[in-house]
Amino acid sequence: MLNGKKVIVVMPAYNAARTLLQTYREVMEHGFVDLVIVVDDASGDDTVAVAQGLDRVRVHRHAQNLGYGGNQKTCYRLALEEGADIVVMIHPDYQYTPKLLGAMVSMISSDLYDCVLASRILGGQALLGGMPWWKYVSNRFLTFAENVLLGAKLSEYHTGYRAYSRRLLEQLPLAQNSNDFLFDNQVLAQIHWLGFTIAEITCPTKYFPEASSINFRRSVKYGFGCLGTGLQFRLAKLGWLTSPLFPRKP
């Protein structure tokens, strides 16, 4: 716990057996983490076996692959069932450093923010950390377009390292979101729609063979999906579109 609030870390896992333990160890170095939830999305390796051997870890396995977004839906449902006040999502592939947990959680436990993002773009070190140039360029373009459509000023919308307050998660219509990688992007658009506050901190970038990634073809599909989400947001704001992603208050 931190400031009297229960902290749960969720890890959407897929073939993460080689990096899960290292990620877990650094997460648990923070004495305030009450529980880690690992949701395995029908991995073909020993991810479940590794997770089951760890202390203060709840393991849930999908019988079939539900996708990155589908995995997160399970993560957040289980975290809320366990009584989490603050939920941190970090990939178990060790691409993001768990050393930022303290800063991220404290910003929510102090009631300053409801969402904290670990941005790979802030600080200008993304390319030096190994981010492929085409991913960097597409990240910057999509972020610019989405900031215009959403009326926001985020440095990026595509990080997989996030912290949320319970009250935020309980209001997000997550069931309406994609089961694929677009899920994360839709969540941020929904947060803006509901008027919750978002903070960002800089996060070192680490790209290596074990780190998860999506190929160019799926990245293109994801990019068009992000633009579509932003357009839906803008049209819904103007009252020209009704979307289950952005429900109107009764």
Where are these regions (language model features)?
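Short beta-strand-to-loop acidic/aromatic patch adjacent to the donor-nucleotide binding site
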Residues: 84-93
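Donor nucleotide-sugar binding loop of glycosyltransferases
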Residues: 16-19, 43, 97
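Hydrophobic helical membrane-anchoring modules
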Residues: 1-4, 151, 175-250
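Short hydrophobic beta-strand elements that form part
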Residues: 8-12, 37, 61
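A conserved acidic beta->alpha catalytic loop
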Residues: 40-48
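Acceptor/aglycone-binding surface of glycosyltransferases and processive sugar-polymer synthases
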Residues: 58, 62-64, 68-81, 98-181, ...
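Short, well-formed alpha-helical segments that are part of the catalytic scaffolds
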Residues: 15-29
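Conserved short acidic donor-positioning loop in nucleotide-sugar-dependent glycosyltransferases
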Residues: 27, 41-42, 66, 75
